[in-house]
């Protein structure tokens, strides 16, 4: 009898541990879902940035067709692009790679690309180079530096979403426990009729009702 009760308790403990493991896995899955959503935004931002770069090259191309490009008008376009945006700096180069003009943060390209080993801040920068097409080939190149760093407000929103999902899982668990105790309160289930338990000799209420009807 004691062995049977111990076996039953072990089975129940295994079931409880299994359910808790599933709950932890679901909560971690909620965190993974939020992080994966954030990662999926990066390719979309890059695609939008390349679309913007192509549009900028179309505006700059007429200013590059002469022997001496109009630096003032090109610089005005670049200032408009880099003003209060996630584009840190922008530069236009001729077909030989010589800088014509640039706008935005005054950071050296070597430092921006961390070519000298100084990687502070370069982890969150991404370079986009788009050719400025002409009739007979590229007239030059446009270089943009994107800020891919996640802002504190965006990170906080992701954390809030994760916490809400976890709270919903815990509430679902609590509701399930309350419903189970409410619906099964005072009722013994079929597993309690096992011959190895002390309650085996006591019939369940359903059987008592059937006997009274007969």
UniProtKB/Swiss-Prot annotation:
The gene is smp. The lineage of its organism: Bacteria, Pseudomonadati, Pseudomonadota, Gammaproteobacteria, Enterobacterales. It is found in: Cell membrane. It is a single-pass membrane protein. The chain crosses the membrane at residues 164-184. It holds the Pfam family SMP_2. It comes from Salmonella typhimurium (strain LT2 / SGSC1412 / ATCC 700720). Keywords: Cell membrane, Membrane, Signal, Transmembrane, Transmembrane helix. This is Protein Smp. One of its GO terms (cellular component) is plasma membrane. Residues 1-30 form the signal peptide. Belongs to the Smp family. InterPro entries: Uncharacterised_Smp.
């Amino acid at each position: 009898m004691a062995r049977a009760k111990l076996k039953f308790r072990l089975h129940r403990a295994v079931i409880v541990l299994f359910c808790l493991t599933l709950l932890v896995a679901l909560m971690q899955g909620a965190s993974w879902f939020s992080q994966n959503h954030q990662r999926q935004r990066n390719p979309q931002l890059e695609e939008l940035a390349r679309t913007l770069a192509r549009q900028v090259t179309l505006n700059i191309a007429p200013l590059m067709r002469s022997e001496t490009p109009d630096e003032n008008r090109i610089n005005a376009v670049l200032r408009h692009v880099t003003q209060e945006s996630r584009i840190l700096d922008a530069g236009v180069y001729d077909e030989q790679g010589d800088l014509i003009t640039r706008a935005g943060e005054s950071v050296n390209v070597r430092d921006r690309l961390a070519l000298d080993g100084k990687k502070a801040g370069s982890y969150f920068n991404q370079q986009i180079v788009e050719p400025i097409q002409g009739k007979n080939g590229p007239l030059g190149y446009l270089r943009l530096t994107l800020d891919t760093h996640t802002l504190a407000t965006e990170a906080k929103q992701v954390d809030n979403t994760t916490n809400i999902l976890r709270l919903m899982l815990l509430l679902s668990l609590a509701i399930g426990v309350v419903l189970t105790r409410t619906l099964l309160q005072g009722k013994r289930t079929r597993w309690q009729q096992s011959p190895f338990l002390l309650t085996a000799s006591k019939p369940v209420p359903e059987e008592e009702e059937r006997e009274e009807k007969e």
